[in-house]
Every structure is written in C-alpha cells, then in structure tokens.
UniProtKB/Swiss-Prot annotation:
Catalytic residues (UniProt): 125
UniProt organism field: Arabidopsis thaliana (Mouse-ear cress)
Record's keyword annotation contains Cytoplasm: yes
The protein's role, per its UniProt record: Provides the precursors necessary for DNA synthesis. Catalyzes the biosynthesis of deoxyribonucleotides from the corresponding ribonucleotides.
Organism taxonomic ancestry: Eukaryota, Viridiplantae, Streptophyta, Embryophyta, Tracheophyta
Compartment(s) where it occurs, according to its Swiss-Prot or TrEMBL record: Cytoplasm
The EC number(s) this enzyme carries: 1.17.4.1
Disrupted gene: phenotype observed: No visible phenotype, due to the redundancy with RNR2B and TSO2. Rnr2a and rnr2b double mutants have no visible phenotype.
Name of the protein in question: Ribonucleoside-diphosphate reductase small chain A
Tissue: Expressed in rosette leaves, cauline leaves, stems and flowers.
Length: 341
C-alpha cells in the first residue's frame, strides 16, 4: 500500500505556515484556555455520543440472517467488509497525518476521541462479520477485502493515496470529508433500507449509531475547513467531490449493486448526488448536481436527520450531563441539514 513517509516529510505549502490551526502552539499540550469555542463544542458533542459494541443485541439478526437470500447475504457481507477496512483507513489518516497537522488542542481532542470511536466502529463491523459468516475461508476473504475484493480495493486506494499525498492540509481535509460524507453514504442508505423492511435490527441499530458518528466527523471536517484562512479554489473542491461521487456510484450501483437487496440503482445514484450537493454547500460551494432526495424515509435517520441527534436518541445515546455546560454555548458554527440551499 506504500509508505506514509513521503507524505509526512512534506514541507508546508505556501500560506500554510500562517494558518492558525496549523501553527505550532506553545500551549498545545494543555487544553485550556479554549481558543475555538466552536471546535470545543464539537468535541463535547462527540464525547456525549460515546457507545460500545456491547450495547448492540445481535440475537435476532443471527436468526434472520439464515432467512436472507443469497443476494442479500452477498450484499451485506461485502458492505460490512468495506466498512471494517475503511474505519481502519480513516484511523490511520488521523493518527499519521491530521494529528500531526493540526496544532490546536481542542481540535486534537476531537481527533483523539474520533480515533477511539473509529476503533469501536471497526470492532462492531468485525463482530458482525464474525457473527454472520461461518465459513473460515470466506471470513478470511472478507477480513482482507482491500486485497481480495477489487471494488473495495479501488475505494481503499483512493483513501490511501490521500493519506500519502504531499498536498496541503486543506486538500486532504476536503478529501476525507468526502470519505466520511460520500463514500459511506450509499452503504449507510442500503442498510437503512433493510431497517425499513424490518430486517436485521442489531445491524441496523449499529448502522444508525455509526452513521451519526460519521455525520459528526464530516461536520467537524467542514468546520475546520471553514476556519482555514486559505481555502481551495472552488474548482479543486468540485474535482475532489466529483471523483468521490463517481467511485461511490460505481461501487454501490454497479460493482456491488444495491438492487441485490431490492433497491433501485438509479435512485441510489441520485441519493449519492444529493448527499454530495449538501456537502458542497457546507464547504461553501454551489450545488452541482441539483439532485433531490429520492428516499423520503432517509429524512429521519442518518446524515439528513441529525437536527435532534444530541437531544434525543433511542437507547439513551447521549451520556448524561456531558452537554449541560454547552446549552448556552458558542453559536459561531451551526451545521444545518435543511434541503433549501
């Protein structure tokens, strides 16, 4: 997969040395005083959303798995294989690059907590594969999906290339906003389709928790980007987003078609474009696809339904009192999921 050394050894691009987020701080080893209240609030939201794999009951899923069609089993197992690998890739980017790039303690605190959550996500997906897949050779193939499954290898290579890239923090930040905001969107949506059908309650509950975590991680990337003094030319943002849309569409509509579980591939393609438009707007760009959300049931869950996420969660998702000190907190940055851009 290549070495990280070439990316880590790069010099700062012109203008980066003057970026407050990236400048070495004398007080970077102590948390207070907080310089960016909006970043601190995002960290406290992440802290309030902690959960563990032990909270997810898979007993019903084990019974329902046997009743699924071969096509449904194929689709779900490959989606889980992608997720199990991708969380490790995101974790490596955080540990090897972003924690070295960013010098603000409250931003590092968020990344540190995100690393913990990515580990839990990876554990959850691995546990799902371990629970559902009994054949040892098939299990080994799925656990090594980056090497053994071409459509997953292509997505992984795009991510790994950005980890190793010598390009600016701003470029890599947008790329990984796409990883968490676009690369996961089709797969999340497909699993929520199973929830709509009343299938696999443990899988779909864990998907809800993880998709909301990833939505927050994507929001955080957009927040940091909004705080950069030198942002990218719009054309560069569009280029990165378009690449991500093409790869995700090919993955979930062609290579691992969602019609295996009864979904319409054309509507899934439209949904991915809708998600991309929303990300573009959050990054300060204009919508490029002009796509509407074709799945009205996604309004209440996942990326589109986060407005009440930290106030209301099935199963007591928010840890008690963690957010109490932020009720009247900073309002400098607020991500909305309204469709009217």
């Amino acid at each position: 997969m290549g070495s990280l050394k070439e990316g880590q050894g790069r010099d700062m691009e012109e203008g980066e040395s003057e970026e407050p987020l990236l400048m070495a701080q004398n007080q970077r080893f102590t948390m207070f005083p907080i310089r960016y209240k909006s970043i601190w609030e995002m960290y406290k939201k992440a802290e309030a959303s902690f959960w563990t794999a032990e909270e997810v009951d898979l007993s019903t899923d084990v019974q329902q798995w046997e009743a699924l069609t071969d096509s449904e089993k194929h689709f779900i197992s490959h989606i889980l294989a992608f997720f199990a690998a991708s969380d490790g890739i995101v974790l490596e980017n955080l540990a090897a690059r972003f924690l070295n790039d960013v010098q603000v303690p409250e931003a590092r605190a968020f990344y540190g907590f995100q690393i913990a959550m990515e580990n839990i996500h990876s554990e959850m997906y691995s546990l799902l594969l371990e629970t559902f897949i009994k054949d040892s050779k098939e299990k080994d193939r799925l656990f090594n999906a980056i090497e053994t499954i071409p459509c997953i290898s292509k997505k992984a290579k795009w991510c790994l290339d950005w980890i190793q890239s010598p390009m600016s923090f701003a470029v890599r930040l947008v790329a990984f906003a796409c990883v968490e905001g676009i690369f996961f969107s089709g797969s999340f949506c497909a699993i929520f389709w199973l929830k709509k059908r009343g299938l696999m309650p443990g899988l779909t509950f864990s998907n809800e928790l993880i998709s909301r975590d990833e939505g927050l991680h994507c929001d955080f990337a957009c927040l940091l980007y909004s705080l950069l003094q030198k942002q990218l030319p719009l054309e560069k943002v569009y280029q990165i987003v378009h690449e991500a849309v093409e790869i995700e569409t090919e993955f979930v509509c062609k290579a691992l078609p969602c019609d295996l579980i009864g979904m319409n591939s054309n509507l899934m393609s439209q949904y991915i474009q809708f998600v991309a438009d929303r990300l573009l707007v959050t990054l300060g760009c204009e919508r490029t696809y002009k796509a509407e959300n074709p799945f009205d049931w996604m309004e209440f869950i996942s990326l589109q339904g986060k407005t009440n996420f930290f106030e209301k969660r099935v199963g007591e998702y928010q840890k008690a009192s963690v957010m109490s000190n932020l009720q009247n907190g900073n309002q400098n940055y607020e991500f909305t999921t309204e469709e009217d851009f």
